[in-house]
Amino acid sequence: MTVLEDRIAMAEDSGELTLDAMFEWLEKMPVPEGYKVEIVGGNIFMSPQRRTHWQIIFNILDQLRARYARQRLMSDVRIDFPGHLNGFAADVAALAEGFEPDDRGRLRYQDVEFIAEVISKDTATNDYEPKLAAYAAAEVPAYLIVDPYTGKWHLHTLPKDGEYRGHQSLDFGYEIDLTGTVVGLVLKTDEFPRD
């Protein structure tokens, strides 16, 4: 698909929409500043970045620096995941040492060791359902959902056969023990703000 001045025309012989075409189209749209855009299951979602949201993201990134070099940490960068048209821009992604972009210069889901998503009210279902399934299918070793509305975090580990076998949920204030995963450290949550 290619984007023209006033319409979208299908350019591929198959007539099927692709993630590349959808993101190309989005790049030409007037997305409001401060909004995150993702494609989940072929649907486009835009959500505002709130102060609380960013504080939690920054806190996690800051703690991950004890184990990961800066260039191995990403936030809001497109990574395509298994499933139908899943182009996610995770709040936090930690990549394996020696990761290499693909031939198009994009990050590969196979290099992701850790994902954290800080939920937004309007897109929370994505983090708890389709993204959970996609990250498990991609065998991301550790997927953390942080919910500033309930003051809880949910850690999913041990991906196998498209689902996570390990799950732990606790309140803010309790540490997130990732020592049994490739991440190999403990995250503190006592400074996570609530919405």
Predicted regions span which residues?
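Gly/Pro/Ser/Thr-rich low-complexity, intrinsically disordered segments predominantly at protein N-termini
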Residues: 1-195
